[in-house]
Amino acid sequence: GPMGIMGPRGPPGASGAPGPAGEPGEPGQTGPAGARGPPGPPGKAGEDGHPGKPGRPGERGVVGPQGARGFPGTPGIPGFKGIRGHNGIDGIKGQPGAPGVKGEPGAPGENGTPGQAGARGIPGERGRVGAPGPAGARGSDGSVGPVGPAGPIGSAGPPGFPGAPGPKGEIGPVGNPGPAGPAGPRGEVGIPGVSGPVGPPGNPGANGITGAKGAAGIPGVAGAPGIPGPRGIPGPVGAAGATGARGIVGEPGPAGSKGESGNKGEPGSAGPQGPPGPAGEEGKRGPNGEAGSTGPTGPPGIRGSRGIPGADGGSRGATGPAGVRGDSGRPGEPGIMGPRGFPGSPGNIGPAGKEGPVGIPGIDGRPGPTGPAGARGEPGNIGFPGPKGPTGDPGKNGDKGHAGIAGARGPAGPPGFQGIPGPAGTAGEVGKPGERGIPGEFGIPGPAGARGERGPPGESGAVGPAGPIGSRGPSGPPGPDGNKGEPGNIGAIGTAGPSGPSGIPGERGAAGIPGGKGEKGETGIRRGAPGAIGAPGPAGANGDRGEAGPAGPAGPAGPRGSPGERGEVGPAGPNGFAGPAGAAGQPGAKGERGTKGPKGENGPVGPTGPVGAAGPAGPNGPPGPAGSRGDGGPPGATGFPGAAGRTGPPGPAGITGPPGPPGAAGKEGIRGPRGDQGPVGRSGETGASGIPGFAGEKGPAGEPGTAGIPGTPGPQGIIGAPGIIGIPGSRGERGIPGVAGSIGEPGPIGIAGPPGARGPPGAVGNPGVNGAPGEAGRHGNRGEPGPAGSVGPAGAVGPRGPSGPQGIRGDKGEPGDKGPRGIPGIKGHNGIQGIPGIAGQHGDQGAPGAVGPAGPRGPAGPSGPAGKDGRIGHPGTVGPAGIRGSQGSQGPAGPPGPPGPPGPPGPS
């Protein structure tokens, strides 16, 4: 075994006691001389004798000679100055030691004096809405490009899905719409989800097939002209009818041109200084969290005072073992901004965060117009994927058909009795203008007049401004199942779309409570091994493009149904997940031009019917000129945070230099102007604590610098290899939040490419599983009544109609002010009161006329406020055609108008 260590010397032992003295023996006989025996034991020591007399002093000795003096030694040669030593090589990483005792929380630093608040800048004037540009001329169709070469044969595709179900049965007749269900309870507001990454935009779909022109309606039979009756006594003016139901909101108009960007406002004053918060506990480093959405930039905090410098440490000892990380502490409140620390070395590039979870899908977009159901195409076999051809030219729109013949007027009612004309009166003098009369009370509403004949369809009005987004309507009865189309192939990933417009900067938040002074972190590893660059994954092959089935013939036009009553809006269903983008369809064939029908003869002018009830609100007229820009409204609510931006390429890490010796405390010089805000660096790993320096003198606060112009984002580069981990630097001051950039102009739409070559037919795909039916929509609130329509052109003067029934006498109105004296009329003969005629029957409804040509395109509306960075959803699929509603009931007759001023008396 190993040699032991020699122990210390023990203490000496105690002395033994002397033995007793022996007695003298008797003298023996002298014997022969024997052999010398062993020495006996020592005898008893004798007692001291008496002292003798002192002797004589000795003689003085001779003094010896003096020795020679030694020579002085030579001084030693001074040694050379030693060479200054270099920093030693980093020691081997020590084993992790036991967790240290938790230290006392550090004392919070002194609150710095709040800086002087800057003057509030004058807000810039709002930008004006730009005038809409002129509509561009229709471009000519491009030539069809050559067909590209066939691509290489791809690998075998994945296994197919389960088989397709059998064909659907015959489509049954459309049922009558059921009664509207009761309004469901209002759902609770859900938790806003985390915005997911923006998916790649899908391929733009080709233009749909132009529908065939409908057949012209059968002209109605012209009725026999009635005998004109006598002019009846005008009845009381009916009261104004109730406001009709709001019309269907039109499709949104084209987006207006972008307005000029407003002037940048001055930065606001800093918020008040908050109290210092408690010191947070030192926590362990948790796992890398998932990348969250980028929050709004908070306001800069108030600059705090410089902390008390620590004592000058001695020589640096050996690096101890790294302690175990503590538990993750609760995040502290944002602290007051401290003084600018000493610049540190650039930190190493951290790993990229995990991709955030897929956010909750956005609200479904407005359903597009219902297109005609195409005939089911024959499924083809799955072929080898061919190369993706360029996009085809859009098909031309077919010519609009001519308007059909308007229906003939119905038969006139029986004529009324002829009244006897009275004698004509003499003309009176012109009266002077009287004062305005007091309006009389409304009389009893008269009987509703007969419904007027339906006029010919008017021309389509100009596209009105975009109306408010309507609430979701109730779920209608399920329509007939259409023929199942062949499965589409997955399209190639489209190119990235242009960047969305920048959102409106949010309001400036209040300064947060400053956090306490945190504990000193553990010493990190100074240098780590660089990670290896991952191998790039194999690129996926583009899927083959399926063959489009032939377009089915358009079905015959069904009978025109009567409009139904407006149903209540059901509760909003859950947001569905965005489906995959469908493959672009083939452009449809150009429809044949319809033949112009024969022009019918003008029918005889019928008698004038009684005054009808107030009709429904007319279509929205063309939008008026853009009004002057109003005052700025209140700031809008902060939108959902946009998707997290992609991490840019990390810069190369610099070589870490050796730490220098601590410098002496120098005097702080004159503070220079504040520079432009630099880019925010990535946080480095926690490095070893450096030697504390001497505290410098606190200087005066500098003037705040102007914020730099925000730069445009550069293209994403290739992620470089991780750099060498450097000594982390101290955290610098938080920069002033940058001003949001102006909204960029939308880029021009690219020219559509020629259609690609048709690939081989694919195999029959397996049908997908039918999705679960969605929940019924939430009942919405009744919309506000729409604006009154523009006055239509005056109709032709009809013949005198039969006298209507005598109205009920209204209540006597209050006497009005004296009206202006009227022009004396010719004295008429007193006629006898006519007998009320029999009300005529309603004429048959005329055949619906053909759709007129489209009206001119209205001017572009003003551009709305830019939203936050939203996600562009996939284009929604065309929904099934809804059942035409039944015709609305006739509105009540309006109350009679106020009586007119009395005329002047005739001459006697």
Swiss-Prot record:
Biased composition (Low complexity): 1-36, 129-158, 183-197, 234-249, 293-309, 403-418, 465-474, 526-542, 569-589, 602-617, 637-647, 701-730, 745-775, 785-805
Calcium among keywords: yes
InterPro entries: Collagen, Collagen_superfamily
Record's subcellular location: Secreted; Secreted, Extracellular space; Secreted, Extracellular space, Extracellular matrix
PTM annotation, UniProt: Prolines at the third position of the tripeptide repeating unit (G-X-Y) are hydroxylated in some or all of the chains.
UniProt xrefs under Pfam families: Collagen
Pro residues bias (residue ranges): 893-908
GO CC, alphabetical: collagen trimer; extracellular matrix; extracellular space
Family, per entry: Belongs to the fibrillar collagen family.
Assembly information from the UniProt record: Trimers of one alpha 2(I) and two alpha 1(I) chains. Interacts (via C-terminus) with TMEM131 (via PapD-L domain); the interaction is direct and is involved in assembly and TRAPPIII ER-to-Golgi transport complex-dependent secretion of collagen.
Note: These protein fragments were extracted from fossils. The tryptic peptides required multiple purification steps in order to eliminate contaminants and to increase the concentration of peptidic material.
Name listed for the protein in its UniProt record: Collagen alpha-2(I) chain
